[in-house]
Amino acid sequence: QRQMCIRDRVIKHEGYTVSYNSDYKIANWVAYELTSKEATSKKNERSNKFVSDPMVKGATAMNEDYTRSGYDRGHMAPAGDMKWSAKAMRESFYLSNICPQKPGLNRGIWKDLEEQARLWAKENGSLLIVTGPVITDDLKRLGKNRVGIPKTFYKVICTITNGKPEGVGFLFDNKDYGKTPLKSMMIPIDSVEKVTGIDFFPSLPDSIENPM
């Protein structure tokens, strides 16, 4: 398994770090910590201004790639987790943090998971979250900048409770899940690692990479 930061351009922003895939013009992964205070902050509202990431050198996705494509501009690190800082909120709309998502996924179970993660952060004090698309060699492309369209997305969440680490993983195909309950989609982090080839928390023993 590869460690998270090998061979990819890693960019650090205020609220998240992104490993950027310059071929597909989307993230390999986006990682950030979400504290209880950040999860409950109401300081800044959504900016809704999608722009190219100024730290991405070379070709990048543009808003026009998504126009009339049938895909949403789906956040990896959600805007709702960035209300604690105007800069973090603004940077969450960088297109390096965005992937083409079916509207039914982006506005459905993916949004449910974002809201659930904020609840877990409130309860547990702090979460480590890594999220992104599953990168494969055969992704279809979108728009004139040939943005990769992921078939699958993942999210892994880890917390330290009473000195003991716990974690949970999720994998979603790029489709509408209707009324599927979030709980039924929980899997061990280890299962996500097998699909992505990424070792998310190398310093943690495999035994903890089980559902919270």
Regions found by a protein language model. Name each.
Residues 11-73:
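Short, His- and charge-rich active-site/binding loops that engage polyanionic ligands
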Residues 56-212:
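Domain-level detector of nuclease and nuclease-like folds
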Residues 2-6:
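Short, small-residue-biased leader/transition segments that mark boundaries at the very start
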